[in-house]
Amino acid sequence: MLPTEKCKGNGVITMKIISRLFAAVLSAAVVLPSMAGSGEVFKADAATNVVISPYNTYVINGGKFEGWGTSLCWWANRVGYSDSLAQKCADTFYGEDGLRLNIARFNIGGGDNPSHNHITRTDSNMPGYTKYNNGQVTYDWSADYNQRNVLRRCIQAAGDDMIVEMFSNSPPYYMTKSGCSSGGTDGGKNNLKDDCYDDFAEYLAEVSYHYKNEWGIDIQSITPTNEPYTNFWYAGSPKQEGCHFDIGNSESTVILELQKSMKKRGMGDVIISASDETSIDTQIDAFKALSSEAKSAVGRIDTHTYGGYKRSELKDVALNAGKNLWMSEVDGNGTAGQNAGAMAPGLWLSQRITDDCNGLNASAWILWQVIDKHVCAAGYNGKKDSGMVDMTKGFWGTAVADHDKNEIVLSKKYYCFGQYTRYIRPGMTMLNSAGNTLTAYDKDNDQLVIVAYNTSSGKSDMTFDLSQFDECGTSAKAIRTSNYENWADAGKININNSSLSVSLEPNSVTTYIVDGVKGGKALTGKIAVNSANVTGSDPWKNDTNNTCKKVFDGSTSTFFDGVGNGWVQADLGESYSLTALGFAPRSGYEYRCEGGRFLISDDGSNWKELYTVKSQPTGGMNYITKLPENISGRYIRYEVPDGTPPNGKDSTYCCNIAEIELYGQPAGMTSLEALAPVKVSGSAPYKDSSDDCSKAFDGSNSTFFDGVGSGWVKADLGGICSLDAIGYCPRKGYEYRCLDGEFFTSMDGLNWDKVGSISGVPSFSTNYINLADKDIRARYVMYKVPDGAPANTVNPDSVYCCNIAEIGIYGKLEGLNGDVDGNGRYEVADLVLTQKFLLGAGDLDKWENADLNADKRVDAFDLVLLRQLIVSK
């Protein structure tokens, strides 16, 4: 990194090692003309309302947060000579009493030509692990002791949550075209020799293997490049190592070679991440340009956010590719706030964290390096240290290492960082939240964490609407950092009617912890909407790409670009009782949803209010689970008001919305009682996999029965039942395989009656066959597909395949067949009672439970069926 302003420390902290570590080895970056952040002053308008919902989770990594971190280079290379400073750093940044970081990005230095002396910083001349002599390469495992010394201590401090990622800034100098690990003679061209891609991969893999097998370092991931598609890595640089790789073939080749080398050493389970571009927008282009093989090899996208702004697009790129996404490096000398003093750099950092996490939905956020400045009168290795910084101005890092005093000097930027890192912990579920807030939910411990910053010189009032949770506590604990406080206990704030109203202090960052929070049960019964039944107003300039039909196309990346008096409406085909509503605003235009209304109607003319968007929603899907009681209808409409909105940006309300989702059941099926089978049987799954018939009754639409030709699945309800409905969900992505499928019922499991068939391709949701008016009594229910080739035009398979995700059977159990003594079980004692009755040696109090074949009499046939039932149990 480039040295920037000096900083004046505000305190010294020494911390003991507890059982936590969070080390992140972040790769080097350069100061760009502008950072990819908002930089705006944030003062919430009077009682700004923010809805927090357990359903509005980040889409990346299933919403699961992996943690916070920093790069170990270069600061660990500088402080690691001193066990005392190394330990203080581990405690300060990774320990329980410190930042509680848990990710360390460890730099595998390439190592420059020993004859070179152009790097002037005391910390950034990273050693390599090889020595080169007349074409002969030998490994020196004593190299890089300093960084390794810090890493080990950080791992001990962080504990079980620790994640280590290896990364490279440059290959060894002798593998480069320029003969220099700082870059090429032309910074815009590849600097790795064309015949050294495999050699470079071997180098990275061998070092990783040694760290794992010789030093016991558990490596989660490795990335071979750092800001590769830039033009500022040039030979003789005074700053650091760096290497240009072209996007496309060059980056693909190094990824695939690294995959080979890691697999060869039995390290194929280590994630290969890519490609740590300096800009969000460049990262999008770089990933898209990878070969299909390289994309498959990449387990996670790592991006820096020094430039670019297309966070939502990169999120979608990662999501559509099935990849995790990290914000793996950023920092800078920015400031924020009004007359904020020492808080200015920390408020800037808070903005960056909030923008990056909410915009990217990243599962980890990693600072470049926590220490960027060093104080030492003697310097280091003949070079002069940068000295202290002015903490009221922008500076890189969060702390300064004073080697003369053997101290770590902390700043407000450090404490602002800790408002996030200490309380939003690995494993929590990240929730999308609006404006100046970052939110996480710990479902295991029933805890909600909200972090909010205020960059205004006056107080800022906010209200957090927690009504979408099933339960929430009675108060929130507040922890605050301001110009006068560091992680201070700011008391408790009462929660009234699921509403948390707070007043943010001027130029402050506050963390709110709410205990006793529960919610987020899986949404079921998603209603399929046929695009042919979607109508609406005209889009802006009659653009045929952004029409109202985009609102129900299943993608939050597309949108309806409606204008003033705009609306979109869907005909559901029949009346539904709604249990939940989901909507996604157009990305970047979330403010246009404020004031929008959702309406419901039985006839498409007379409308009732379903929900009004009272404040700017968050990006992504927003789910509303507390709708008016007993609300039902056939038509759903979203519209915006007339006139000028209060957003201060548009002259008229614009109907901009990306997606709408609806959940519920057909109106006549709202009081259905589920019947649990006592036994499930079926045909064999494809290749005898674990996706057997039991998956059709495991309660999850995510699993499925992978049955093949002539396949079937049967449920034994344990007794005669009056059936009201059968629900079913097709296997996702293979919905067409349910077309022509049939449902049968039986009293005895031998004689079957067809009660329903699937006449169209069903949606991936719960679909229903209504049996309430058919007076159907049965003990067994079976789903099966026809024999032979599909007799329809939409199924491309050569044979019908019995693929189904879930089946639900609804009704009432009339009595447990076989439970002759009425104790709730069928067992040998029931067999004995029935046999005595048939021999005239006793009576039956519940004779109907012994009538297993439902012929209105108890005879030897029932005795045989009861014996079979008990044996099968």
Where are the regions a protein language model picked out?
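Active-site neighborhood of glycoside hydrolase catalytic domains
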Residues: 199-206, 210-218, 228-333
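N-terminal catalytic cores of secreted or lumenal carbohydrate-active enzymes
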Residues: 47-220, 224, 256
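Aromatic/acidic polysaccharide-binding cleft in carbohydrate-active enzymes
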Residues: 327-416, 432-433
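Aromatic, loop-rich ligand-recognition surfaces of beta-strand-rich domains
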Residues: 552-611, 617-670, 684, 697-756, ...
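Cellulosome-associated attachment modules in secreted, modular CAZymes
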Residues: 21-22, 32-42, 665-668, 812-873
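C-terminal beta-strand-rich structural cap/linker in extracellular carbohydrate-active enzymes
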Residues: 493-518
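Carbohydrate-binding surface patches
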Residues: 422, 432-474, 507
